[in-house]
Amino acid sequence: MIEGKTFNLTLATSSRKFLEGTTNTYGYNKLSFWGPTLILNQGETVTMNVKNELKEATTVHWHGLHLPAATDGGPHQIVEPGKTWSPSFVVKNNAGTYWYHPHLHEATQKQLALGAGGLIIIRDPIEAKLALPRTYGVDDLPLVLTSRRFKENQITYDGDNDKYGDYQLTNGTLDAQTKLPRQLVRLRILNAEIERGYVLGFSDNRVFYQIATDGGLVDKPVPLKRLTLMVGERTEILVDLGADKVGGTVDLMAYNSNQTFGFPGGEPDTGGANGSFLNNYDYRLLHINVVAPTAKAVTKVPETLTRNVFVSEKEATAKRTISVTDGRPHFAFDGKPFDMHTTNMVVKLGATEVWTVKNNNIFGHSFHLHDVQFRILSRTDREIADYEKGWKDTFYLPKGASVTFVAKFDDFASDTDPFMFHCHMSNHEDGGMMGQFIVSKDPAAVKKDAKGMINFRAQTKHPLPAAEVVATAAQASKPAAVFAKSDLSGNRLVLADLAKTKPVVLFFIEKECPCSRDAAPYLSQLQAAYGRSCSVVGVINADEVGAKEWAAAVKPGFPVIPDPDFAVIDAYGAKRSVYVTVIAPGGTIAKAYPGYNADSLSEISATVAQLGGVPSVKLVWKDAPGELLAGCPLK
C-alpha cells in the first residue's frame, strides 16, 4: 500500500512459485504478481511516475478515474522500455475502489496475464464520516479475482486459447485464505480476469450488503445473496461475521455452475480454446477463518451511505447506438476493428448523452467507458439489478441484449487526445473490440478527412512482438515465394521476371493504416534513387477498388498489386503493414524487416546497391523515425 501525492511505480519482470518450479511474471515495485494498492484523496493533485523496466513497451491506465485524456494511460500514452511517464492530475472521483492496469493495444492480455495491475482506493469526506470498516488488510480487505492457465509452470496468454484459467488466483494466490475478525468486515472485490465472469455468494448462503459500485458509494446498503461481477467491474460489500464463532470458517464462492452458453466461463468444455476446469462449476474463491474482533469493531450496517445526484436522461442532447458485431475471427463495434489513428465520434464538452450498446452476437461482453461514470437506464435482458444502480464505468452485456446508459462529459476537452470505449475482456480488446471518442469544446471545428474520420497518426505506435522479430529474421536465405499479379495499371508483374537480374523490394500495405501512408514516400524515394536497378512493389490487403483509393491518396512512386486473398502477404509471412522484404537477383530473400526507421531504410538502400551491382546512393530520410516502427495488423 502506498499513500501520498507522489507515486512511483516501476514495472519489471519477476518470478514466483505457483505450482512446482518457478513461474516468470510481471510486477510493480519488485512485487512478483500485481502491484501495490494506491491510496488517493479526493481533491488532491497527484503525480504518477511510471518507469518501464520491461524489454517491451507498456502503458498504465487508471481505470475508472475522471482525468484528462492525455493522462488516462490508454493505448496512446506509451511508455517505452527504460523510460518514465509522469502524468499529474487532480483526483476528482468519489471514494471507491478503482484500479490500474496495462492498456497497450495488442499486448494488454499478455501483460495483464503475467501480473501487471493493482488497486486504487480513493477516500473522500463523505465516506470518511461513515461508520465503515477501513483498516486496510484487517477489516477492509481488497480481493483481486482472476485465474490463469499454465504450461510447464509458465503462464500462457495466447488470445482466445488462454482466456480461461484452470487455476483460481485470489490476490495472486492459489487456494487463498485469510483471517477476518468476528465483526462487520468490508471486501473490495475486483474482477481482473481475462474473460471469466463471477456469480459471487457465500458458502452458507448468508446475506451480505453491497455498499459501492464501480464509481463509489450507493445511497443505501443493498442486501444480497448473489452478485454477478464481470471483467473490470468492482464492488464493495459488507459481511457480518458477528454471529460466527471464533475459529469458525466460511467461504466466498463463485457460483458459476448451470450457466448458459454466452456467459463468460459458462462453456461446458474442460479443455481447448473455450474450456477450463473451472467452467460451469461452483468453486471457492477465499477461505475465511474467523478470529477475535478488533478493539474498535464496526458491528452495525449503516442505514444510509450517501445521496447520489445522477444525471437525468431528460438533459441529454444526443443519443448514440453502438453495436457489437463480427466475432469471426474478432469481435468489433459497428463492424469496424479498432484503428488507433482515427475516430468518428466527437462529444461536446459538458454534454449529457444517452448511449445504447447492442450485442447482436452469440456471446456476452464486458463494456467499459473511459473518462466518466454513468448510470444504467435500461436493459433488454432483465430488470436493472439492485447491485448495478449506482455509478458505473463497466457493465455486463449479455448475448442478444442491449444496455442503455446516460453520462455527462464534463471537465476535460482535447481535439487531439481521445478516450476509449471497449470490451474489457482483454483478448477481445487486443483483437480490435475497441473504439475511441473525443470530447471537444467545439465539435464543428474538429478537422476530419474525406471519410469523416479524425486522424491521430502522429501519436500512434504499435508493439512489435518478439516472436514476429524472430520469424522475420528467419526469412533470410529462403527462396522467395513466386507470384504473378497485375498492378493498378494492368501490367503483369511476375516475380521470376522482376528478380531475374535485379533486386526486388516488396513493401506490404494495410489499406487504412496511416503507418503505410507515412512510410510510402520513403519507398518512393528509394525507387527514384535506383531507377531501373531495382523494383519496388507495393502489396496491399485490398481489392482493386480499395487499392486504387489508397494509391490516389498516397501517389506512390512504385507499382501496387492488390492482394485481397492475402496470397502474397501470407506467402511472405507479413503480419503488419510497413513490413519490407528484399529479394536478391535470382529469387532468394536477402533480408526482411518487420518495420522501418531511418537505419533500416539506409540498410535497404545499401543492400539494393550491393545486390544490383551499382554505386550506393546516399539518401536523406527526412522525418523518418529513429526507432523501429511496425504498422497495423494486415488481418
Predicted segment positions?
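Structural microenvironment flanking redox-active thiols in thiol-disulfide oxidoreductases
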Residues: R517-V554, D565-D570
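Thiol/disulfide oxidoreductase modules built on the thioredoxin-like
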Residues: A552-P556, F566-T607
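Thiol-/selenol-based redox modules, centered on thioredoxin-like
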Residues: P585-K635
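N-terminal "domain-start" segment that seeds a small globular fold
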Residues: L464-A496
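Short active-site neighborhood of thiol/selenol oxidoreductases, capturing the structured segment around
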Residues: L495-R517
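Histidine-centered copper-binding motifs that mark active-site loops
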Residues: M1-D240, N258-T260, T270-N308, E315-T325, ...
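Short, surface-exposed loop/turn segments at beta-strand-coil junctions that are enriched for proline
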Residues: V90-G96, D240-V246, K408-T416
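C-terminal substrate/ligand-recognition segments
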Residues: S312, A318-I376, D393-P418, H422
